[in-house]
Amino acid sequence: MKLLVVGASYRTAPVAALERLAVAPADLPHALARLVAQPYVSEAVLVSTCNRVEVYAAVSGFHGGLGDICAVLAESTGVPPAALADHLYVHFDAAAVKHAFRVATGLDSMVVGEAQILGQLRDAYHWASGADTTGRLLHELMQQALRVGKRAHSETGIDRAGQSVVTAALGLATELLNSDLAARPALVVGAGAMGSLGVATLSRLGAGPVAVTNRGADRAVRLAESYGATAVPIADLTATLSTVDIVVAATAAPEAVLTREVVTRALADRKPSRGPLVLLDLAVPRDVEPGVADLPGVQVIDIDRMAALVANGPAAADAAAVERIVATEVDAFLNWLRGADVAPTVAALRGRADNVVTVELGRLAQRRPDLTDDQRDEVARTVHRVVQRLLHQPTVRVRQLAAEPGGDQYAALLRELFDLEVPQTSPVGTVPEVVVPEAVPPLGGAAEDPSTGGQ
């Protein structure tokens, strides 16, 4: 099995395209089941966040796996294959491992170094595990990605250099308001992970009073109580909007919550002297209807604007340190993967030896029926010990050699020498020519030639 990543992110797709590609949590089990039902896909994890939609898959072939994944994405999202391909990137084997680790460390985030992606990756892995679509390869990849992400945050200053998306967005809000957030009334719409982060960040920055609203009132109450905020019914959304200066919108609603009509009514009761009403739309699909940005007295900061305005580079030293961690961990993972690839060959060799021993002991029993049970047992134990000792050193050594770059040749030689029948896969790091199956249009400029490992 080989590792393949197919996805789109804020780097390759505008927010409107990401909205169309986003897979709602309720739809994840079906999408995952469809992925592993494809002929070339055996394992799958689907990551769908505000800034990216990615499929991590174990595939038996590059071209077939790519075609299967693109077909399921088109089916699950309703996006025509041609439109889908315009925004996709592809990473294969070593490049896929590197991409996974860069995502986990926050190096690939809109705001470099933000740690929220770790929780999102963990959630995606739990969804896939619950749907029984992970196996040895993706289990190990996800576990190591989460570990590498934690290591990057604990061993470097990337947490200080890189802000969370909410922190960065609120930094832009202070510029638009021409003041800090102290004593600025705020509203958070949504009580999920991003909404919770919004309340926490607003409280830390001294904004207040802070109100929280959510379709599920209980969650809003619990979140508000945790930070000394106030929960308000979703039915009071318009009235509350007229009393605040900052809104963090981060729901998982399928349609816009802050429509032009709702905001217009709120503005009618809001004093112009308060300055602009700043709406931070951090949701995918968008919580703020596009036409709201045209209203006088309103400033909308959405994901597209974040990508254009946020300086998302941490200090050079911190970024370089994290890149070094990623490079080291990628090498370690590839060593493990190469060792895992040789395991079936070693198992086949030991199986062949066991079969030979069984056959020869059977022949001995026929030729020497006079042997007692104790004698036959002693002979069997002796022969097994001899075989195990003969095999121990070469099998240990071939595992060591296979873990080195180019080590796949040793397993191949072992199969050739002993005429072992082991299912063959292309070695790690072997990059096929990118020829997309006829069922899927050629990938557009956003897609990566896997031989480059580009971002």
Swiss-Prot record:
InterPro entries: 4pyrrol_synth_GluRdtase, 4pyrrol_synth_GluRdtase_dimer, 4pyrrol_synth_GluRdtase_N, GluRdtase_CS, GluRdtase_dimer_dom_sf, GluRdtase_N_sf, NAD(P)-bd_dom_sf, Shikm_DH/Glu-tRNA_Rdtase. Its EC number is 1.2.1.70. It is an enzyme of class 1 (oxidoreductase). The keyword NADP applies. The record marks H99 as: Important for activity. The active site is at C50 (nucleophile). GO terms for biological process: protoporphyrinogen IX biosynthetic process from glutamate. Transmembrane segments: none annotated. One of its GO terms (molecular function) is glutamyl-tRNA reductase activity. Pathway: Porphyrin-containing compound metabolism; protoporphyrin-IX biosynthesis; 5-aminolevulinate from L-glutamyl-tRNA(Glu): step 1/2. It holds the Pfam family GlutR_dimer. It catalyses: (S)-4-amino-5-oxopentanoate + tRNA(Glu) + NADP(+) = L-glutamyl-tRNA(Glu) + NADPH + H(+). The keyword Oxidoreductase applies. Keywords: NADP, Oxidoreductase, Porphyrin biosynthesis. NADP(+) binds at G190, A191, G192, A193, M194, G195. Substrate binds at T49, C50, N51, R52, S109, E114, A115, Q116, Q120. Homodimer. Belongs to the glutamyl-tRNA reductase family. Catalyzes the NADPH-dependent reduction of glutamyl-tRNA(Glu) to glutamate 1-semialdehyde (GSA). During catalysis, the active site Cys acts as a nucleophile attacking the alpha-carbonyl group of tRNA-bound glutamate with the formation of a thioester intermediate between enzyme and glutamate, and the concomitant release of tRNA(Glu). The thioester intermediate is finally reduced by direct hydride transfer from NADPH, to form the product GSA. Possesses an unusual extended V-shaped dimeric structure with each monomer consisting of three distinct domains arranged along a curved 'spinal' alpha-helix. The N-terminal catalytic domain specifically recognizes the glutamate moiety of the substrate. The second domain is the NADPH-binding domain, and the third C-terminal domain is responsible for dimerization. This is Glutamyl-tRNA reductase. It comes from Salinispora arenicola (strain CNS-205).
